[in-house]
Amino acid sequence: MTLILGIDPGSRITGFGVVQQTPRGCVYVASGCIRTGAGELAERLQIVYRGVREVIQTYGPVTMGIEKVFMAKNADSALKLGQARGAAIVAGAEEGMEIAEYTATQVKQAVVGTGAANKEQVQMMVMHMLKLTSKPQIDASDALAIAICHAHTRSSLLPHGLGAARSRGGRLRL
């Protein structure tokens, strides 16, 4: 049974979700948000890095799924998002984690069944799949969805003898 970390990166709020992959599906372990406040970008990135590292050290996941950068409303937002992703990826890499990237469409498809799902639909399916009794924060819900997507990807690869998710194209090899 594998512990999986999902990360929904952001320069102000980074969501995290930890699930345990079992033969019967995913089981909820933990979720939350790393809030950086309104400081300088370098300080906020350091908070993201330290927060992700703390989650990894607290729960001990061995693999991480993280959302890919999408084209934001403006280029500056996309750059900041990419930098927050980088901080989270470095935290995982330093802990020796296997890291995989997923587009928002891939995550929605894996959790809801359609890549056009909205955030509320994703949140409701995450609650249903993990048997949660209350709504997680939206960023934490997105991170749990990423973890579930990563679990589905891993389980679809393992029966074919391909090993871990890093064997597929588009994965980070660190």
From Swiss-Prot:
Residues annotated to bind Mg(2+) 2: E67
Catalysed conversion reaction: Endonucleolytic cleavage at a junction such as a reciprocal single-stranded crossover between two homologous DNA duplexes (Holliday junction)
Annotated residues for binding of Mg(2+) 1: D8, D139
Pfam name, any one: RuvC
Location, primary (coarse class): cytoplasm
Binding note for cofactor: Binds 2 Mg(2+) ion per subunit.
Repressor in keyword set: no
Cofactor (UniProt): Mg(2+)
Catalytic residues in the record: D8, E67, D139
Gene Ontology terms: cellular component: cytoplasm; Holliday junction resolvase complex
Database matches in InterPro entries: RNaseH-like_sf, RNaseH_sf, X-over_junc_endoDNase_Mg_BS, X-over_junc_endoDNase_RuvC
GO MF term set: crossover junction DNA endonuclease activity; DNA binding; magnesium ion binding
Function noted in UniProt: The RuvA-RuvB-RuvC complex processes Holliday junction (HJ) DNA during genetic recombination and DNA repair. Endonuclease that resolves HJ intermediates. Cleaves cruciform DNA by making single-stranded nicks across the HJ at symmetrical positions within the homologous arms, yielding a 5'-phosphate and a 3'-hydroxyl group; requires a central core of homology in the junction. The consensus cleavage sequence is 5'-(A/T)TT(C/G)-3'. Cleavage occurs on the 3'-side of the TT dinucleotide at the point of strand exchange.
Assembly with partners or alone: Homodimer which binds Holliday junction (HJ) DNA. The HJ becomes 2-fold symmetrical on binding to RuvC with unstacked arms; it has a different conformation from HJ DNA in complex with RuvA. In the full resolvosome a probable DNA-RuvA(4)-RuvB(12)-RuvC(2) complex forms which resolves the HJ.
Family: Belongs to the RuvC family.
The protein's name in its UniProt record: Crossover junction endodeoxyribonuclease RuvC
